[in-house]
């Protein structure tokens, strides 16, 4: 086995992101949850069309919607071969102290992580769509592996399915749309969304304010897939 020392982790990603979100609100950021049906490219403004045909004008739009980003980019006229890596996690509420650090077992294809609310067994990959239907045979297989690894007699108290947005080269898309430079893409981070979040935000900030970018940005430029 291999032990990675001095690494960083979080025992509750949801609480971590909620704290960041609350800081955003404290500096007078605004949040509104609405479904967008179209993005209209105007000369001076970007117009977002909502369910009630209400049009909102913006100077810049950042498309950062995970596995749904491909749908939004198509509305604007940019097409990316983005798919979902469907991944599962099982939470065992009474077993959070059974290990002290994340443990990955290669032949199983998932990690065990001690969390605030229990032991999480998470991972595996199903390449497909954003279909929310759970593959119960996959759940049963994971439950069996957990029992083989630990002295766990209970069934998981929570089962969750998530969608990892993935592109053909396994790298994210971060950069300006080729159709309108005021549309900025930031998606496709697959398994590394939380890990790369702050670095990706720094890149987006530099793009917005026309600051100098590192040469490595070419590796994640949206235009790299142009034929």
Show where each model-derived region lies.
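Helical element adjacent to the flavin cofactor pocket in flavoenzyme catalytic cores
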Residues: 2-56, 60
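Mid-domain beta-loop-alpha active-site segment that forms a flexible
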Residues: 3-22, 67-68, 138-145, 193, ...
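C-terminal catalytic lobe of FAD-dependent flavoproteins
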Residues: 7, 13, 148-227
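Active-site catalytic microenvironments for nucleophilic, acid-base chemistry
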Residues: 23, 27, 71, 75, ...
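Short, conserved active-site loop motifs that form the nucleotide-linked donor/cofactor pocket
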Residues: 28-30, 119, 183
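Hydrophobic/aromatic beta-strand patches that form the interior of the parallel beta-sheet core
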Residues: 32, 62, 184-186
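General beta-strand recognition
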Residues: 47-49, 120, 184-185
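Active-site substrate-recognition segment that forms the wall
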Residues: 56-181
């Amino acid at each position: 086995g291999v032990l990675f020392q001095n690494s960083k982790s979080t025992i509750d990603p949801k609480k971590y992101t909620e704290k960041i979100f609350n800081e955003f609100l404290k500096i007078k950021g605004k949040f509104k949850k609405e479904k967008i049906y179209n993005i209209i490219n105007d000369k001076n403004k970007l117009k977002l069309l909502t369910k009630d045909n209400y049009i909102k004008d913006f100077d810049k739009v950042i498309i950062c919607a995970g596995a749904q980003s491909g749908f939004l980019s198509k509305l604007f006229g940019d097409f990316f071969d983005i798919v979902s890596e469907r991944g599962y996690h099982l939470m065992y509420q009474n077993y959070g102290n059974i290990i002290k650090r994340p443990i990955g077992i290669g032949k199983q294809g998932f990690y065990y992580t001690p969390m605030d609310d229990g032991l999480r067994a998470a991972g595996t990959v199903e390449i497909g769509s954003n279909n929310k239907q759970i593959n119960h045979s996959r759940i049963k297989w994971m439950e069996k592996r957990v029992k083989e690894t630990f002295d766990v007699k209970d069934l998981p108290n929570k089962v969750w399915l998530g969608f990892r947005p993935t592109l053909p080269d396994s790298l994210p898309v971060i950069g300006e749309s080729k159709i309108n430079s005021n549309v900025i893409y930031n998606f496709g981070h697959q398994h590394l969304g939380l890990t790369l979040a702050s670095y990706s935000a720094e890149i987006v900030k530099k793009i917005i304010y026309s600051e100098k970018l590192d040469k490595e940005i070419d590796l994640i430029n949206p235009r790299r897939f142009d034929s």
